[in-house]
A protein has these predicted regions:
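N-terminal glycine-rich "phosphate-gripper" loop used for MgATP/nucleotide binding
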Residues: 54-58, 65-67
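Short glycine-rich anion-binding loops that position phosphate/pyrophosphate groups of nucleotides
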Residues: 11, 57-60, 83, 169-171
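Gly/Ser/Thr-rich active-site loops/lids in small-molecule metabolic enzymes
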Residues: 157-201
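Catalytic core of DAGKc-family lipid kinases
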Residues: 85-162
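ATP/nucleoside-binding phosphotransfer catalytic cores, i.e., glycine-rich phosphate-binding loops
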Residues: 135, 140, 151-154, 203-287
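Proline-centered loop/turn at the N-terminus of a beta-strand
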Residues: 72-74
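Short aromatic-centered micro-motifs
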Residues: 148, 170, 225
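ATP/NTP phosphate-donor binding region
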Residues: 1-51, 55, 92-107, 118-127
Length: 287
């Protein structure tokens, strides 16, 4: 018997209703369903799950992807609300795609994920993230100083609101808001981006996917670590963490007719193009 787990946005009634309808449909097909905790943790009974379905937006999807990574199964995003980069299908098309997963004919796309581990002075379980790992300032009115090493080589010490290490999937999320580059998901890399750095150099680094990034909290202010916005961990001054590609990539269920990544970028950010009435501005030099 197939078993499908659900992670739902509890604050959206349409998401709750959609999840209940999908669960009823699955049960009528003879499948078992389980509602996973909203934080993306695993079923209390430890039973295996064949698919995790998120019903909501990209934030809900990230929690579902976290659970799916531990369960070793794919994750499918049913979009409710605003368009995102991760949710894949409208509620009306969800049953067809779920059926394809359970019979083994669905298209599965592997996405690089991240893991962060404690080093000297830090104490927390290793964390997994699909989008990003972030170390930010603890006090709102203070900056945090973070020394950056890549593969053992010292790079710089950022005095900033924080530092993000993102995957290509996460390059359109918080890293983008911090002026990081957009990287297509098939180009595996680590993207290191400072947040509002108070120094002349405030640009991102795009690193080899096999790189290991270490961040050390310097100065007098502690930092706060999180992965994909989940529960934060305080990092005292002098503590270090290591961030690298995870050995457990995310497995995303995709539609065969899904739009390409750059088409999503154009739609999401409203980029101008041939369909626009206005002529593009001249950007060449005068004369």
């Amino acid at each position: 018997m197939s078993r499908v787990g659900f992670v739902t946005h509890p604050g959206r009634s349409v998401a709750v209703e959609t999840a209940e309808e999908l669960q009823a449909w699955l049960q009528a097909q003879g499948a078992d369903t389980v509602v996973l905790p909203g934080d993306g943790s695993l079923p209390a009974d430890g039973t295996a799950v064949d698919l995790v379905v998120s019903v909501g937006g990209d934030g809900t999807f990230l929690r579902a992807a976290y659970a799916a990574s531990d369960l070793g199964c794919p994750v499918l995003g049913v979009k409710v609300g605003r368009m995102g980069f991760l949710t894949e299908v409208e509620p009306s098309g969800a049953t067809e795609l779920i059926s394809a997963v359970l019979v083994g004919t669905a298209r599965i796309e592997r996405r690089m994920a991240l893991t962060v581990e404690p080093l000297e002075g830090a104490d927390f379980p290793a964390q997994w993230g699909l989008n990003e790992v972030m170390v930010e300032k603890h006090a709102r009115h203070r900056l945090v100083r973070l020394a950056v090493e890549v593969d053992g080589d010292y790079v710089t010490t950022f005095s900033a609101d924080g530092v993000i290490v993102a995957s290509p999937t996460g390059s359109t999320a918080y890293s983008f808001s911090a002026r990081g580059p957009i990287v297509t998901p098939n180009v595996e890399s680590l993207i290191l981006t400072p947040i509002a750095a108070h120094m002349v150099f405030d640009r991102s680094f795009v690193l080899d996917p096999g790189s290991e990034v270490s961040l050390e909290v310097m100065g007098e202010e502690s930092g706060v670590l999180s992965a994909d916005g989940r529960e934060s961990v305080e990092l005292p001054v002098g503590s270090r963490v290591r961030i690298r590609a995870s050995s457990r990539p995310a497995a995303l269920v995709r539609r065969d007719d899904a739009p390409g990544f750059l088409s999503l970028v154009r739609e999401k950010f409203g980029l101008p193009g041939d369909d626009d009435d206005d002529e593009p501005d001249d950007v060449g030099s005068p004369g």
